[in-house]
Amino acid sequence: MSKIAFITGASSGIGAACARKFAQGGYTLLLNARSTDKLKALKTELETTYGIDVLLLPFDVRDRKAAAEAITTLPERYQAIDVLVNNAGLALGMDKEYAGVEADYDTMIDTNITALLMITRLVVPGMIARGKGHIINIGSVAGDAAYPGGSVYCATKAAVKVLSDGLRMDLVDTPLRVTNVKPGLVETNFSVTRFGGDKRACRQGISRYQTADRR
């Protein structure tokens, strides 16, 4: 019986790359994202290429009710999740901390922190009961140090690091493992989303002589 991996934010970028890698290893996949069309295309690709079983879970990770319903009502053959990849996340805008859009702050915090925590709470108890499991949180090097215009996003990724460290401590008396992966800049749609679809803005650098650079 193949192992099962559940990946959030799987429709593109790092999430889709993770799905392809696990598919190569013969995993049964539970793929989550908001974009049903992209998920369906990925499902077809993976099932055709690797002959694996893929179940789609199209919901917004910020929707606690939808997340709980999807995970607690999984068909029996998909319930024994071996690997959870908390990948769903985003950055919005490059405004100064005191001048940003409140709705953007809410979206980043709800997606990058709260949803990760809620999904983990839904999946980990089953792993503990089965005596095995691996939680992989996709953090960022941005969680180690802030950069101009990114303080809120950086704060959310710092939270991912702390949540990962804390969960690892909480599970120290179990066989479960916790990994916090911290990528740097990756060529995905991440920056396009950040700038509301403005691809030119993604290529603009930071102006010189920021306060932090002054001597």
Q: Over which residues does each language-model region extend?
A:
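Residue(s) in the substrate-gating loop at a strand-loop-helix junction
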Residues: 140
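The beta1-alpha1 cofactor-binding region of Rossmann-like NAD(H)/NADP(H)-dependent oxidoreductases
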Residues: 36-37, 58-69, 102
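Conserved glycine-rich Rossmann-like NAD(P)H-binding loop of the short-chain dehydrogenase/reductase
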Residues: 25-41
